[in-house]
């Protein structure tokens, strides 16, 4: 579909932003395909991807790189786009190392493929459903004490997670805090692909539920990147200025099933799967570039294929980096803290005048 794009009338996004968005989305999609390619050859350990959710890259570009992010596990697009805002950061290398469980993985040391990096202000999450929402609310309250920073905490999650008691408790906490008049600058992003692994969300459920939450809410289609950028800008501006929570309902699709082992054909019809390909966020981003006269659809296809080769070559090169050799290495961070190490870290954090003693 990229190759068939022709110039249109949509010039709502400047060419540089459109190019960054497209590049971030493509990198994320190709990382997902690379994960399956590696697994088929006996390499790599993680195949849950972000394909179809890449519109979250537009959410990242509409925020500041200093805004703390606690992300859904399908947030590859966001992670790559956030890295594009920080000079010299290698998001593709980060994700590949996690995928391959290399000890050089910068966030988990090869223990789990998870989105996170201190330099990007992306806080890593566990795989426990909705467990990061309370953390996001708490972080927003804590950060709001420094009114001069004006940070917005962004927290993304899936439509099925919305039904989890942990999510409901966190959303209620945010609303309750705002109702008291206390600042809680958090932007929730519900990435709604209509499926909780193999269980479909009832049609209209998410829209109805978030519409009753008593906070500022906007709903956008993920294959309309100009509107995702605009809606995120509006909502983040509201949160930043009013110090109150808001929610972006991001309607998207899911490609490649839940994970590599998922037999999607067992619970979805062929026509449903095909219909999703009419809502591809990458085609939406590519349309922005073609409409701006920056390139033709065939140019985008050629570039996409060249990037596929490059990312696969990088993945193969990373196979030479070290893996864990023992369970002891894997569990090392769980070991009881050594008193001398604790004292050293405390001194380094607080300075020589504080925290240097455990007495």
Tell me what each language-model feature is.
Residues 1-44, 288-291:
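Cofactor-/ligand-binding subdomain signature composed of acidic, glycine-rich
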Residues 11, 46-49, 128, 160, ...:
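Hydrophobic alpha-helical scaffolding
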Residues 182, 187-192:
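Catalytic or ion-translocation cores adjacent to nucleophile or general acid/base/metal-coordination motifs
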Residues 147-149, 202-234, 278-305:
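Conserved thiamine diphosphate
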Residues 47, 70, 187-189, 219, ...:
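Structured core elements
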Residues 170-174, 230-237:
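Glycine-rich, charged/polar anion/phosphate-binding loops
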Residues 30-33, 40-184, 197-207, 211-214:
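Cofactor-binding active-site loop characterized by glycine-rich and histidine/acidic residues
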Residues 4, 238-359:
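Glycine/aspartate-rich loop-and-adjacent alpha/beta segment that forms the canonical ThDP
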């Amino acid at each position: 579909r990229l190759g068939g794009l022709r110039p249109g009338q949509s010039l709502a996004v400047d060419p540089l932003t459109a190019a960054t968005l497209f590049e971030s989305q493509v990198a994320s999609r190709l990382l997902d395909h690379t994960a399956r390619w590696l697994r088929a050859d006996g390499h790599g350990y993680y195949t849950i991807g972000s394909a179809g959710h890449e519109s979250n890259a537009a959410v990242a570009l509409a925020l500041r790189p200093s805004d703390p992010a606690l992300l859904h596990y399908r947030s590859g697009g966001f992670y790559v786009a956030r890295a594009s805002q920080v000079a010299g950061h290698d998001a593709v290398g980060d994700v590949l190392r996690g995928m391959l469980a290399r000890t050089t993985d910068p966030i988990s040391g090869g223990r789990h493929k998870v989105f996170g990096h201190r330099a990007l202000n992306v806080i890593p999450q566990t795989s426990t459903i909705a467990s990061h929402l309370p953390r996001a609310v708490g972080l927003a309250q804590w950060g709001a004490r420094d009114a001069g920073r004006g940070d917005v905490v962004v927290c993304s999650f899936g439509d099925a997670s919305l039904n989890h008691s942990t999510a409901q408790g966190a959303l209620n906490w945010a609303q309750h805090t705002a109702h008291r008049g206390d600042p809680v600058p958090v932007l929730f992003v519900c990435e709604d692909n209509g499926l909780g692994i193999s269980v479909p969300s009832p049609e209209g459920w998410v829209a109805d539920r978030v519409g009753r939450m008593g906070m500022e809410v906007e709903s956008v289609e993920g294959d309309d990147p100009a509107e995702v950028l605009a809606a995120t800008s509006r909502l983040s501006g509201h949160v930043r200025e009013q110090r109150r929570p808001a929610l972006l309902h991001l309607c998207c699709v899911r490609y490649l099933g839940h994970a590599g082992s998922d037999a999607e054909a067992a619970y979805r019809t062929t026509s449903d799967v095909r219909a999703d390909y009419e809502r591809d966020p990458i085609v939406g981003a590519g349309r922005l570039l073609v409409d701006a006269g920056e390139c033709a659809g065939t140019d985008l296809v050629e570039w996409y294929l060249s990037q596929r080769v490059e990312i696969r070559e990088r993945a193969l090169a990373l196979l030479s980096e070290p893996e864990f050799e023992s369970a002891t290495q894997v569990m090392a961070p769980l070991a009881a803290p050594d008193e001398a190490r604790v004292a050293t870290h405390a001194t380094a954090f607080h300075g020589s005048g504080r925290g240097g003693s455990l007495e």
